[in-house]
Swiss-Prot record:
Region (Disordered) location: 1-23
Family that this chain belongs to: Belongs to the eukaryotic ribosomal protein eS1 family.
Lineage: Eukaryota, Viridiplantae, Streptophyta, Embryophyta, Tracheophyta
Name of the protein this chain belongs to: Small ribosomal subunit protein eS1
HAMAP family: Ribosomal_eS1_euk
Localization in the cell: Cytoplasm
Keywords per UniProt: Cytoplasm, Ribonucleoprotein, Ribosomal protein
Subunit structure: Component of the small ribosomal subunit. Mature ribosomes consist of a small (40S) and a large (60S) subunit. The 40S subunit contains about 33 different proteins and 1 molecule of RNA (18S). The 60S subunit contains about 49 different proteins and 3 molecules of RNA (25S, 5.8S and 5S).
Gene source species: Nicotiana tabacum (Common tobacco)
Residue spans of biased composition, Basic residues class: 1-18
Keyword Magnesium: no
UniProt keyword Ribonucleoprotein present: yes
GO biological process: translation
Amino acid sequence: MAVGKNKRISKGKKGGKKKAADPYAKKDWYDIKAPSVFDIKNVGKTLVTRTQGTKIASEGLKHRVFEVSLADLQKDEDQSFRKIRLRAEDVQGKNVLTNFWGMDFTTDKLRSLVKKWQTLIEAHVDVKTTDSYTLRMFCIAFTKKRPNQQKRTCYAQSSQIRQIRRKMVEIMRNQASSCDLKELVAKFIPESIGREIEKATSSIFPLQNVYIRKVKILKAPKFDIGKLMEVHGDYSEDVGVKLDRPADETVAEAEPEIPGA
């Protein structure tokens, strides 16, 4: 009778159980710095694998995109529906310097704007800033009732919609092409472009909830560290400053006591 191997008897594995490696042991934390156009400069922190051989940590951080709520950047909860995208452009020490890389609305805000008995008007345009950034801007607006209007609906005619859309494109193009990216972002925060569109189109049809709802950067110029530092200003101002102690508060050194004297 042939004696075979009993497969049910489990064979002992070679070596002991491998110790689970800590995934954070080979990683470093870096501070994310927002451009100076925003009130809050310290956005948060990000992880990256430590420099090993030819794989440099700072190279792994560059062009990383972070999405931040404008409410956190401006300390204003009324701006919580705006999402700002920041792209890592350079690494200095443990600081990641970012620049504006787009803007969007939260889904719940967009859904809350759409209502019955009104017309939704949208427009988009590709523009170029003075510092050679090519952006695509999307605008959204809604019609509203005229003063003392009794009728429930406030629908705009097709010809009026076309006129309003032309005005939107014209204003967006003029506003973007006359300034650089930093100045344009400063216009997005208080929604000054939306207010200008609302004012310019009031003679055609009264509008409400006029917003630049989305901004995409299609093309960016060649990286320039000088321009990036202009965007950030002195990013070190958030860090504590060393203070010199006044002369009257300095503690005099005690004279050493001589034993047996």
